[in-house]
Curated annotation (Swiss-Prot), chains A, B, C, D, E, F:
Name of the featured protein: Nicotinamide-nucleotide adenylyltransferase
Pfam families tied to this protein: CTP_transf_like (PF01467)
Signal sequence range: none
Family as reported in the entry's similarity comment: Belongs to the archaeal NMN adenylyltransferase family.
GO MF term (any one): nicotinamide-nucleotide adenylyltransferase activity
Pathway connected to this protein: Cofactor biosynthesis; NAD(+) biosynthesis; NAD(+) from nicotinamide D-ribonucleotide: step 1/1
EC number of this enzyme: 2.7.7.1
Keywords tagged on the record: ATP-binding, Cytoplasm, NAD, Nucleotide-binding, Nucleotidyltransferase, Pyridine nucleotide biosynthesis, Transferase
Domain of life: Archaea
Length: 171, 171, 171, 171, 171, 171
């Protein structure tokens, strides 16, 4: 069975990694959908889709996850919820299930007839992307403990922290 | 060095595969950009982006190419040539060069300051996507010899031939 | 005279029905424009355009309104207020007036030279779409009294209440 | 059962009317989808969506067809065939089948799991929209015999012939 | 009176310049609308909107035309003819007339209630943008005589000839 | 050197005028980019792009600024920050620098390799567009002192105050 795991991954944190591992114990192949691919350079969405693809890829390699079992595919938004499943389906190989806890994603895929796999709330209280981004914008290094080691490295290498600190300045 | 290899890959044929191998002798990582990602279900563009991603992936695996050196990323069209390079750049990891023989792609990436690597015209006379699609629509099995074995299999498995034969009927 | 009556109709309530009746006493034909047609599956816009068209149609039939005097036409948003009147005009038969109390709609149609018919604020304090949607999301059946009987039936038949309750869950 | 009947209806001719009648003998309700709604003012697509809605409505009334069994809904194009069914579905009430002879429409709805009803080729050799438009642009009144009487009247009333004759002039 | 003069100006030639002069004898201010602003880097549309703005500006200055009487404003396409006038109107100061010989432009502005000023066919047989572009792509310097001197200079300075020669190569 | 000065100019106020003058002491030509060109008829964005172009033009003329050194070019939004610089570049003549104090604009142009010229915060406490628009919507004439005289005149002439007062009414 092939399943989707959609998210914005701004950034890809340890909770996301736990979901990937949990999923790979249940499905043959996992398609990580990097959503809102067109967004970047804001405090809410600091990284480009390509930067997120790179960070996820490095994290998976660093964790020794078999890349032959994973696809990482950026998908831009479409401003029509009722066509979103069909839109995503265009960008990815055929799949049978979706891994998500998000209410909107669940409703849309259920109405489209897909199976929904709900992962446990891995470290939900600790790994919250909003908090991680707030620390990044403040330049507080505590964000580094919340993401896989390889993600922290690539984020620093790509200059994302400097970008976020600039973006958080006043006009 | 990381390089892009953009194409529509309708379908991914033996000439494309030769370019991938040629590129991987020259660069560290190759990003295969599956262009016109929004197109499908026409005789000119029969496969969805996700179907093309799957076909390319299977071909690379079948050829024993190291997946850690390759990214396969679908990118939709943007109706503005002068912003196309920046648009593509959003979807992919940072890169320094582009592998192409296409005049428009060359002009756009050169004007944007990228290095262009021009591969030899591998089997240009034999592997022409337009001809391959014509054979597919006719149901003539000669198309199978023009694509990597794994691509032929996945195309049949996905029902692309049946789709093309239906699409070529008269109203 | 033919007039437009634009709204989002999320959902079509008794105040809307009163406006339709008021209008049909003043004009020969009424075009009900179901706006923001691309929106659905959110707490703010739960129903698809087609579901809203169906609900309105059933309400009009149930009330014995002559369907030959009414058009129900979904229109998606255009992100340009100054071209919105021309955009709407494309989707509907020629018209001379617009029925509205909305300040933006009034300004845009007045600047375009159309007559504006301002209906009385029918049950404004009782029939507020925001409140109706809040009750629907809570599963509180009081919303049913605020919409025409046929609308309540079709909303339940289409599973809109279940959809809204799912959407209002936490991640 | 509710079924869709999609077309561009540039203009709605006697062959289209025959399909509507044929369909209403087989389904409870018919949704006439006026496609390419955004197109108008060209020789290929002379009428706006609203003008086409009006022409179809008048033809149905003139033929004594019960309007309670028919929906006429304009739908703009989406540049993604694989999401087109979901896009159309947003604009219309729930349906189970589609009435069409068009190969692309058939493939897309079949892949989406809908039943396809194929009507006979009513007067295919006589009622060809391309020919009708050519006569209209030439100002040759023979086009009038090819469309329902009410359509001919509304086309003349709306000034479509004059528009087409202007558009066919040389720069 | 203020009037529009819409065109693609690929490139701005001596016929266009004659229309500008003819117009400025009849109206107080002229708004030159550089249409299809999103197009560039093709043989049909080689120059970006900004390059065309620059070329027109230089030509007007070189001819001693008072810049206080002219606006040069790029406008992207909108894929909806019936909303095009409203779309253009958004980008430009209020105006009363349009200068054009193009049938579609005439029909659209006349239906919107604007006055149409039809200029004489200045050197129609000599100054044809299609022919000028063909000469440019061939590298034949005869194109230079067909455009104002300042336009020829800026085209060479911007590297447009080299771009067109590259674009006209075979894959 | 040619530089860009991007803004929304809702409306163009005395602080903006000071930046234009400051820039023209440092660069040869200034391109005033009227951003969010597609927005209008809201309290946040009351004026169309064309109305803003007209207001800026009148202000520059009234101040005796040489129009041969200035371009005023409307540019619509693109929903992709990482492609925004390339998008803007399409609409304007070639340039080397950008005049801005906006953090996002700085980050985007710096990442694209452009020089950023940061003007002093001219009358920052006095000339705040948000406050000016609030006064305009209230009908408080104090806004007139905050914009160049010619801008105040054209705003009144175009009926912008009346439009804003209408838009600020309750439904």
């Amino acid at each position: 069975m092939r399943a989707l795991f959609p998210g914005r991954f701004q950034p890809f944190h340890k909770g996301h990694l736990a979901v990937v591992k949990w999923s790979l114990e249940r499905v043959d192949e996992l398609v990580i959908v990097v959503g809102s691919a067109q967004e970047s350079h804001t405090l809410q969405n600091p990284m480009t889709a390509g930067e997120r693809v790179l960070a996820i890829r490095r994290a998976l390699e660093d964790e020794g996850i078999d890349l032959r079992k994973v696809y990482i595919i950026p998908v831009p938004d479409i401003l029509m919820n009722s066509a979103w499943v069909a839109h995503v389906r265009t960008y990815v190989p055929p799949f049978e299930a979706v891994v998500t806890r998000n209410p909107l994603v669940k409703v849309l895929f259920e109405e489209a007839g897909y199976e929904v796999l709900e992962p446990p709330p891995f470290g939900r209280e600790k790994y919250v992307a909003t908090n991680i981004r707030a620390l990044m914008a403040l330049g507080d290094p505590k964000w580094e403990e919340m993401v896989p080691r390889a993600v922290a490295e690539i984020i620093k290498e790509l200059g994302i922290i400097r970008r976020m600190r600039e973006l958080s300045k006043r006009d």
